Amino acid sequence: MPGANYRAGAGAGAGARRPRGARDREEDGGGLEPAAVARDLLRGTSNMSFEELLELQSQVGTKTYKQLVAGNSPKKQASRPPIQNACVADKHRPLEMSAKIRVPFLRQVVPISKKVARDPRFDDLSGEYNPEVFDKTYQFLNDIRAKEKELVKKQLKKHLSGEEHEKLQQLLQRMEQQEMAQQERKQQQELHLALKQERRAQAQQGHRPYFLKKSEQRQLALAEKFKELKRSKKLENFLSRKRRRNAGKDRRHLPLSKE
């Protein structure tokens, strides 16, 4: 009969899409078992088309399908013993590892925190440098330096010659240079403060404040230095040293005399 032939043909097509064992289990059990389907379908996947393979993947699941294509059954995968991670009974005992495993180049050791050096001059925790506040805070150091200078002078009187005399002389000279540099720095701070007060007064009067150039500030500082040297009667010595220094510089630029 035509109807019977059609049903037979449909049944044959369904059998080509799915193996007989899987269809029988589906009809008997009412559902698909991934392990049983995988065992039955392992032999028939090579003859299936791409659409049939996609349908099979949707029926058994992606994981089981990949194991099926790779040739590993879920039973074999489940029969493998789980790999246990290396562990130790006591945390203070060294770790036991297999001698067959190659030791990595970069071993995992206990991390040690890096010691970071802190320079208070460039650290934000110390705040911004303010010369006025610094001088007021460490003003007691000037008294200590003055006492040390007097002590060096007394020691210098005891040692009139020899190596100790040269060391004390160099120390006294370095202390005097530091004192002169400190006085010069203090004069510059006073000059900046005076200019700042003058600009503030101009702004209060309604005038536009005038900011001096660095060259003009250096000229004002040099004029104050000359006034201070003149008051202390050291201007002539300063000018003579300045002339000798300039003469030496000019002599280096002169052409050499030919014999």
From Swiss-Prot:
A motif (Nuclear localization signal) lies at residues 241-244. It holds the Pfam family RRP36. It is found in: Nucleus, Nucleolus. Residues 240-259 have a biased composition (Basic residues). One of its GO terms (cellular component) is nucleolus. GO terms for biological process: maturation of SSU-rRNA from tricistronic rRNA transcript (SSU-rRNA, 5.8S rRNA, LSU-rRNA); ribosomal small subunit biogenesis; rRNA processing. Residues 1-38, 233-259 are annotated as: Disordered. It comes from the Eukaryota. Residues 157-205 form a coiled coil. Keywords: Coiled coil, Nucleus, Phosphoprotein, Ribosome biogenesis, rRNA processing. Signal peptide: none annotated. The modification Phosphoserine is found at S73. One of its GO terms (molecular function) is RNA binding. Belongs to the RRP36 family. Involved in the early processing steps of the pre-rRNA in the maturation pathway leading to the 18S rRNA. Meningioma antigen. This is Ribosomal RNA processing protein 36 homolog.
